[in-house]
């Protein structure tokens, strides 16, 4: 064994061994308990970042630990390979998305191997291959036949100059990112999957997810947004149709003073025929981004349509306004406004001088003060005719019942959740397998024509999708008749909604899933990824599992038993102000810093001499240039050091602050472990441990070893507090470093301890542990070694510490056998000089003894 720890030599050697032995390849084995550990698959952007490294290290630690428990562990990896960035990169680099993507996959695969992750590479998949997306296309056609897929027009961001649809992130300040033209809202036909048909089940089954974070479940509950309310119909004077609105607060209905409709509503369109101001407003609304988040923060605007609706209960006429905060695609495209008791309605009414009528009393029973804001709390009604004096629930029911009896109201359950629009007007995605015949009939692509393959050898102009630009690509024949293919592609959330299931049978050619394999491995035991995926991906992931269950492919209701959302990785961020006042962000690697005595940064500059402004720790990002390249760190310190720091610096679900000093600390610790094993093995063979012949000191050290095993097992397995597990191993290492190594049993005990330490560290730092296990002559490869088991007998204390007090004041602490009687403890206490001094010449009037803990002698 060499004296120095050289990760650059051992890590590549160990990785080659894993590859050659196919150590982490697994198959179904009914005789073993399975464990499926999955980290969210990466987008092949070109290089791994620290967020990836953290996610995948957590997964690998759990997978390796479960493997050492003797389970059949599946840990696969693949590539979420379709998506918009590839199109941008292709245009920029004058290539096609496919070669750019495949080059990135090859590069990032090497980076993953360099970090020592124990993946079953035989199951690797890339979602952009026809072998993968063919089954998604087939499944989509089956959903269509079941009535779960439909087409309708829906609003998109449209660039009139490029004649193309833009994703929300391609709209910057209301303009096209490419040509700076003002973006419009445009209605175009798109494909939808009926996720709303599963809304109740998606909501109710959240209660089954005991091991998902409450934050994620709450976000999904709110996103699904089930509400109980009343749908109310209003007559409108001089208008051919009625207006229907939905409210969850019928108790406030007597305070409704106006209605608001979307700019695209037929009533607004009709009113605009003779109203130039309204027509201009409708035009302006066309330029509103379709993202819901934008809607929440933008300025609320409106124009009076001139139409008057009739309040069904009071008979009063109330104005109908067109407003930019009402969307046609949400609900009926019309809302009722109660400005006294809804803040948005209040702000709009205040801005345009509309009537504000209070109908709910304040908590103290007084009339509410509406001079500054609306009263949004529930309460007792007033100013509401026959409903005065009713509380929220009674008023809800009374008003709902009255509207129903009049034929103008109906109780309804509503959902905030909308059906999933899966059409994207992009090129780099899976083609949607639908065709249109010459007579206008729309139908699924026949099975014998699947997959509909996306051509990869294309030229990107950055404007139009190559399959839309090439009229020949769309032409096909179905049942002998000419037909046109759909040129939209799937939302890339489609691919990431079922990949976890395909990992169980990636080579299966008879269908989407081999049910036998899928049902052996599924559900996933632990799924690891960022909380930013809480609603979109994690909801579609759950939805797809239910769709596959109902298609008879899987027999479970939910895709993953446990969800672990890892925290973000933060790093120092610095900038200097350029000549034009712009911020130039400087990498923390290039910042020369001065710190105060507490280690805080007080001054910084870069190599060019710019004075840097330090903005604190923030999420590693390209925009702030504060990402740290994992590859550089691995080359400098080794993969094991980077992995150990990642797991030690912070609890897995909290933010992690990147500190190179911490990385250096992790590296020093591994050097200490190496040194201790080196010194131990240099002394030659070791005798067998004889636990009955150990001295008290040896027993105490062995007790520490086994208590550490018990703690680390609990920390990794049950609590998943990996940082405290590492801290416990470090503490034990400090004790081992000080332990005597001269006697035969000293060395035998050290051998037992080091074999345990190396196995406990193995999930975190597998390369060094693989090597040290061999040097310690552990049986077989450590990858197949069992997790150490704490010896209950070794952990039993044979002595205990008793605090001795005289008149309630501590005078000594004594060590006594655990089975010592009160008499023996008193006798032993009396031998202590400090105790004897206070007992001299006095009478012990009372003895308070708490066995094994406290002896209090009351004297006088």
Swiss-Prot record:
The keyword Transcription regulation does not apply. A motif ('HIGH' region) lies at residues 42-52. Disulfide bonds: none annotated. GO terms for cellular component: cytosol. It catalyses: tRNA(Leu) + L-leucine + ATP = L-leucyl-tRNA(Leu) + AMP + diphosphate. It comes from the Bacteria. PROSITE patterns: AA_TRNA_LIGASE_I. Its main location: cytoplasm. A motif ('KMSKS' region) lies at residues 619-623. It is found in: Cytoplasm. Its EC number is 6.1.1.4. Belongs to the class-I aminoacyl-tRNA synthetase family. This is Leucine--tRNA ligase. The gene is leuS.
